Amino acid sequence: MAEEFLNTHNASILLSAANKSHYPQDDLPEVALAGRSNVGKSSFINTLLGRKNLARTSSKPGKTQLLNFYNIDDKLRFVDVPGYGYAKVSKTERAKWGKMIEEYLVTRDNLRVVVSLVDFRHDPSADDIQMYEFLKYYEIPVIIVATKADKIPRGKWNKHESSIKKKLNFDKKDHFIVFSSVDRTGLDESWDTILSEL
């Protein structure tokens, strides 16, 4: 359990960064969280940290436009990556986000693993697939977390999991976690898997 290693409730937003000159300058391990807009990234962060609104959840997707660094008990950081695939953002803006995300993922020595969130209800989007392929290409460790599991009857979980894995061309060596911020399904497994990568 995570509590044995760190006080998960001792968490705060540290800073927001647009480029590497703004990144924290130390060697704390970092876990990046990526996913398309409205996949439930903020809810995932809040559930893991046992907080209601540390990460701001928004009904307006595409709100996170910077890399948000969260300090967790001075032992590790979560890095909330801007949600991708939001239609109402201009192409220029999207390209800017893409560059910012890529710079962080490829150059950041502190980065230990990326939690890539997908919506359990649907097949992965082209952006989801592209993100997974990008991480595999650069050999960045990745955990797939399928959110909103409470919206799917348990009897259909296997079908949805198989479908997502097939579309992603999922590597069996990677972790796949079924998660719900509503009933906390996958909470312990998420922490155990993240900590095993640090």
Swiss-Prot record:
Cofactor needs: Mg(2+)
UniProt record similarity statement: Belongs to the TRAFAC class TrmE-Era-EngA-EngB-Septin-like GTPase superfamily. EngB GTPase family.
Domain EngB-type G residues, every copy: 27-198
Annotated protein name in UniProt: Probable GTP-binding protein EngB
A single BP term in Gene Ontology: division septum assembly
Binding site for GTP: 35-42, 62-66, 80-83, 147-150, 179-181
Pfam families found in the cross-reference section: MMR_HSR1
Disulfide bonds: none
Nucleotide-binding recorded as keyword: yes
GO molecular function: GTP binding; metal ion binding
HAMAP family: GTPase_EngB
UniProt-annotated binding residues for Mg(2+): 42, 64
Origin: domain of life: Bacteria
Keywords: Cell cycle, Cell division, GTP-binding, Magnesium, Metal-binding, Nucleotide-binding, Septation
Main function: Necessary for normal cell division and for the maintenance of normal septation.
The keyword Transit peptide appears for this protein: no
Gene that this polypeptide is encoded by: engB
Gene Ontology cellular-component terms listed: cytosol
